[in-house]
Each structure stands twice: as C-alpha cells, then as structure tokens.
C-alpha cells in the first residue's frame, strides 16, 4: 500500500474537533478542471510507464467533514488536503483575496509531468470561521 493511500485512509477516519467538541463542517466539491502534459519533460526525464493517471476532466468528488473522497487520486489529495480541510472548517480567503470566490481554491496535483488542476469550493456552508 502506498503511503498516500495510508494517509488518505487515516484522513477518512479522522474526526475534526475543537477542544474535543465535534462541529459542523462544510461540504466541499472537488472538480477536475484541466490537465497539462509536458511531453518534452516526460521524454527527457521520466522512465516509461504504462498508466499514469485515472483522473478525467470534469470529474467531481465531494469531501464530507474534510475527508478524502472515495476514488480521488491519493497524490492529488496530498496536494489539496490542507485547502479542503480549511474550507470544510469555514476558513477561506487564501492569500488575501487570491480567488474571486473566497470559499474556493485552484490547486494542482504534484505530478510534475502531467499535473491536473482542481477547483475546490464549498457547496454546503455549515461551518463558520472561528478566528
């Protein structure tokens, strides 16, 4: 089992709490927006592989309670997990107004040869910021 699968499994079983009190968390939608493939970098640096990525443009997942959604690429989850968890907890406005929708983020997976960009947004606002 890959370490990222273990991390994703752990995240699915972890309950977010504030001082031991479980609170409502936002539902967060994750949408695969676009993939860029760097054929020149693949040719120069990567050993041939048969299968690289199962994600398809337009695919969507819903994170409930900040957990890794079933079927989401574990490597992509590693990249977006802090943003999904923050949005689920009612925190947003990353980097002082980076996104037009302050309760969203655009994150790419960490595959340097064929990164996928994901739009992450709150779809059900149950939490409020506790700052």
Regions found by a protein language model. Name each.
Residues 17-18:
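N-terminal, intrinsically disordered charge-dense segments
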Residues 36-37, 65-71:
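Short, charged beta-turn/beta-strand-edge "cap" motif at the junction between a beta-strand
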């Amino acid at each position: 089992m890959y370490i990222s699968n273990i991390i994703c499994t752990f995240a699915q079983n972890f309950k977010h709490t504030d001082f031991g009190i479980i609170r409502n968390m936002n539902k967060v939608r994750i949408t695969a927006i676009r993939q860029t493939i760097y054929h020149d970098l693949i040719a120069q640096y990567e050993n041939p592989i048969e299968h690289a990525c199962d994600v398809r443009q337009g695919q969507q997942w819903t994170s409930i309670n900040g957990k890794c959604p079933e079927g989401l690429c574990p490597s992509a989850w590693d990249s977006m997990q802090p943003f999904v968890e923050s949005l689920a907890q009612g925190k947003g406005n990353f980097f002082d107004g980076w996104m037009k929708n302050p309760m969203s983020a655009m994150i790419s997976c960490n595959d340097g040869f064929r990164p996928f960009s994901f739009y992450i947004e709150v779809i059900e606002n149950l939490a409020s910021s506790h700052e």
